[in-house]
Each structure stands twice: as structure tokens, then as C-alpha cells.
């Protein structure tokens, strides 16, 4: 990340190992007659602890996905920059019986496994969140048309429906999904409402088909 203020350039970067974070401040201290900078002062400081705290604040403690707090922040950021995105909401089907039958520990392990699969459904430029007990959200960078949205929903559904083997127990769940696109379907608030409505419409259809 690069920022500038009062002729000071701030660069945040991490080592290739991914576990050492630094902030580099570059300050011009001498200029030539042509106005070009001839001498710089570079100051580097460790910001690893700050990055770690920010990561913890934005991460769901159970699944390792981003949390609802960061979800709202990401959508706000997209809207402030007027960058298009596609939002997918998904709610697990048949999750409650897993908790009732095998206990909450098994339910937690299932949520972790679902989160792991969802990571494979998105690109590096996208985001995956846990926003409720068994509710998740995916934010895809860029707008997608209806055909692509339905393809993505089918991919999510097939990924989640594959049986899970947890502690020797085979568990099968499904996913009810809804989607909306910013700015095609309105502002970020309207997009969230529409995606939520479509998700619950999908859940009603899934219940009716049982």
C-alpha cells in the first residue's frame, strides 16, 4: 500500500515469507536547482503487530474467513470507489440437524470444512465471509450477468453438496444462494437486501422439493 502526505511517501509491504510487515517512509531532504530531489531519507519500522491486530479484528475466529464487520467495510469501500462487485449470499441447508444429532463441536467442524471449500470457489481478488451462524457471503470483484451468476451459484451448490467426512461421519448439507450486482441492482444496501431476498426464495424452493 502506498500513500503520500506533505511530500512524504509511505509504503507498507511484507516480506516474501508473508510474516514480516514494514512501513517505509521516504522523505525528500535535498533538492537540486532544477527542483528534482537529490537526497532522500528512508525510515523503516516494524508494523507486524498492528497488521496482526487488524487481521484478528477482521477475521472470523472459527472459520478463518473474514467476518461480518469487515464485510460491511469492504462493501462500503467498493461503493466509495464506485467499483462494481457481485454479491452472493448463502445459507446452509440441513445444518441444524447436524448440531442436534452430533453436537455443536461437529457443527463447528462442518462450518470450517465448508469455509475451506468456499475459498476454492473464488479468485484472489475476491472475498469470502462468514456473516452469521451458518450464513456466508462471497464478494466477487466486478459485475457478472445473470448467466454467470447462475453458473457461480451452481458451482457453490455442487461444492457444498459433496459429502463431508468428519471424524468418520459422512455429513451431507446443501446451500441456498442469492445474488445481486452493484451498481446494476442499486447501492450496496439495496444489493444486500436483494441478495438476501433471493437467498430465502431459494431456501423456500429447496424445502418444497424435499
What label would you give each PLM region?
Residues 19, 24-40, 48, 187:
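Short loop/turn elements at sensory-signaling interfaces that couple input to output
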Residues 54-55, 68-84, 115-123:
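Short regulatory alpha-helical coupling segments
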Residues 127-130, 171:
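A short pre-motif secondary-structure segment
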Residues 95, 114, 128, 136, ...:
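Hydrophobic framework residues that shape the active-site pocket
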Residues 150-157, 161, 165-167, 173, ...:
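Catalytic-core segments of nucleotide cyclases and related cyclic-nucleotide turnover enzymes
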Residues 34-63:
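Sensory coupling linkers of modular signal transduction proteins
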Residues 54-73, 90-104, 112:
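Conserved nucleotide-binding and Mg2+-coordinating catalytic segments in signaling enzymes
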Amino acid at each position: 500500500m502506498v500513500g503520500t502526505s506533505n511530500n512524504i511517501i509511505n509504503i507498507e509491504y511484507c516480506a516474501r515469507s508473508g510474516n514480516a510487515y514494514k512501513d517505509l517512509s521516504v522523505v525528500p531532504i535535498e533538492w537540486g536547482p532544477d527542483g528534482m530531489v537529490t537526497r532522500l531519507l528512508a525510515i523503516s519500522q516494524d508494523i507486524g503487530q498492528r497488521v496482526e491486530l487488524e487481521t484478528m479484528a477482521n477475521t472470523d475466529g472459527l472459520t478463518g474467513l473474514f467476518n461480518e464487520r469487515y464485510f460491511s467495510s469492504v462493501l462500503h469501500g467498493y461503493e466509495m470507489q464506485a467499483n462494481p462487485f457481485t454479491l452472493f449470499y448463502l445459507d446452509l441447508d440441513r445444518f441444524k440437524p447436524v448440531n442436534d444429532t452430533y453436537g455443536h463441536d461437529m457443527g463447528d467442524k462442518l462450518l470450517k470444512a465448508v469455509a475451506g471449500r468456499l475459498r476454492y470457489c473464488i479468485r484472489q481478488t475476491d472475498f469470502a465471509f462468514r456473516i452469521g451462524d451458518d450464513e456466508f457471503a462471497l464478494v466477487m470483484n466486478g459485475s457478472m450477468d445473470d448467466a454467470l451468476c447462475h453458473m457461480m451459484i451452481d458451482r457453490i451448490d455442487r461444492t457444498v453438496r459433496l459429502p463431508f467426512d468428519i471424524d468418520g461421519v459422512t455429513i451431507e448439507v446443501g446451500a441456498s444462494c442469492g445474488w445481486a450486482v452493484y451498481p446494476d441492482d442499486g447501492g450496496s444496501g439495496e444489493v444486500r437486501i436483494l441478495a438476501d431476498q433471493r437467498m430465502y426464495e431459494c431456501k423456500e424452493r429447496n424445502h418444497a422439493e424435499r
